[in-house]
From Swiss-Prot:
It comes from Renibacterium salmoninarum (strain ATCC 33209 / DSM 20767 / JCM 11484 / NBRC 15589 / NCIMB 2235). Binds to 23S rRNA. Forms part of two intersubunit bridges in the 70S ribosome. The keyword Iron-sulfur does not apply. This is Large ribosomal subunit protein uL14. Belongs to the universal ribosomal protein uL14 family. The gene is rplN. InterPro entries: Ribosomal_uL14, Ribosomal_uL14_bac-type, Ribosomal_uL14_CS, Ribosomal_uL14_sf. Part of the 50S ribosomal subunit. Forms a cluster with proteins L3 and L19. In the 70S ribosome, L14 and L19 interact and together make contacts with the 16S rRNA in bridges B5 and B8. Gene3D superfamilies: Ribosomal protein L14. One of its GO terms (cellular component) is cytosolic large ribosomal subunit. Transmembrane segments: none annotated. GO terms for biological process: translation. Keywords: Ribonucleoprotein, Ribosomal protein, RNA-binding, rRNA-binding.
Length: 122
C-alpha cells in the first residue's frame, strides 16, 4: 500500500534511485496504490548522468510492495521492498532494463513491456 509521501526504490536503469509519491492516480479521493497502480512522484535520489535528475516529477507504476496482496485464487504475494518503474507519458517504461521480480498483476493492467523486460514475474 503506497500513499502520499511514501518513498520507493526505482527498479529500472533511468538513473533514479529513490522516488517519493506525490499522488495516487485514479480518482479524486483515492488514498492507496498497490501493484500495477500508477502514481505521480518526484525523484529524491539519482545518479549523475542518468535520464532523470533529482527534483524531476515523473509518473511511475508500482511493481513491488511490502504489504501483502490477496489474489483471486486465495494466495498472497508480498515483497521485501516497495519499488516502482518510471514511465513515459504513453505508458511505456522510460528505462531499458528492469531489476528484480515484478508482480503478475502488471499483466492484468496491460504493462506488457515491463513484463517482457523483467527477469522474473511472480
Amino acid at each position: 500500500m503506497i500513499q502520499q509521501e511514501s518513498r520507493l526504490k526505482v527498479a529500472d536503469n533511468t538513473g533514479a534511485k529513490e522516488i517519493l509519491a506525490i499522488r495516487v492516480l485514479g480518482g479524486s479521493g483515492r488514498r492507496y496504490a498497490g501493484i500495477g497502480d500508477v502514481i505521480v512522484a518526484t525523484v529524491k535520489d539519482a545518479i549523475p548522468g542518468g535520464n532523470v535528475k533529482k527534483g524531476d516529477v515523473v509518473k511511475a507504476v508500482i511493481v513491488r510492495t511490502k504489504k501483502e496482496r490477496r489474489r483471486a485464487d486465495g494466495s498472497y504475494i508480498k515483497f521485501d521492498e516497495n519499488a516502482a518503474v518510471i514511465l513515459k507519458n504513453d505508458g511505456d517504461p522510460r528505462g531499458t532494463r528492469i531489476f528484480g521480480p515484478v508482480g503478475r498483476e502488471l499483466r492484468d493492467k496491460k504493462f506488457m513491456k515491463i513484463i517482457s523486460l523483467a527477469p522474473e514475474v511472480l
